Amino acid sequence: MQGAESTRLSIRMRGGSLGHHQALEKEERFSRFRSDEMARLVWALGAMAAERVFYGENSNGVGGDVQSATAQAAWMVGASAMGPEPFVVTPLDDESEEQARERVLKRFESIGLQIMNRTSGGGPFTENPIAGVLSDGDKRKLAAQILGQAYVSAYNLVLHNKEAVERIADELVVRREVFGDELVEILDAAKLTMPEIDYSSEDAWPTM
């Protein structure tokens, strides 16, 4: 996430949490653009994506991440008029550009609906406005697309940097917890990079 710095990476159990990555903004901000919010979603779904890359499935330990990511996506579409980020996709031989875009959005939506937390109910003006947003068909569709897009980005990020991520994990297994400047040095040394995602390739799509 741009403008944020990692402050703690831990696998010590705290309050039922089996792992924790903390990142704080370098400067206080009162608003964020869609790209900033999407980066936060990719971060939130990173652990789930890593489980998928390394183990081929996710555990029930991602419940908290799923809940917070769902709330964020719902807030983005319900209160901030946001939708999925722009993306480039190569049409198939019998497709128009619009049809190719719709095909990708449907795959985002399918993935996002599986990720989406739906353990509570509510209306738009009740104590649970997030559930109210998700009860609206159009908003629910957009929230699912955003979640799916963020998860695909997180999955490809981990897959592209798999060896570096594994080195970081091995270091953490030994040390259990890393803080501050030492953590920043470890992450900088890993040289993680964001890949260009080819949505026309099946390799880019996680198996859910």
What function would you assign to each model-found segment?
Residues M1-M208:
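Soluble catalytic regions of large protease machineries
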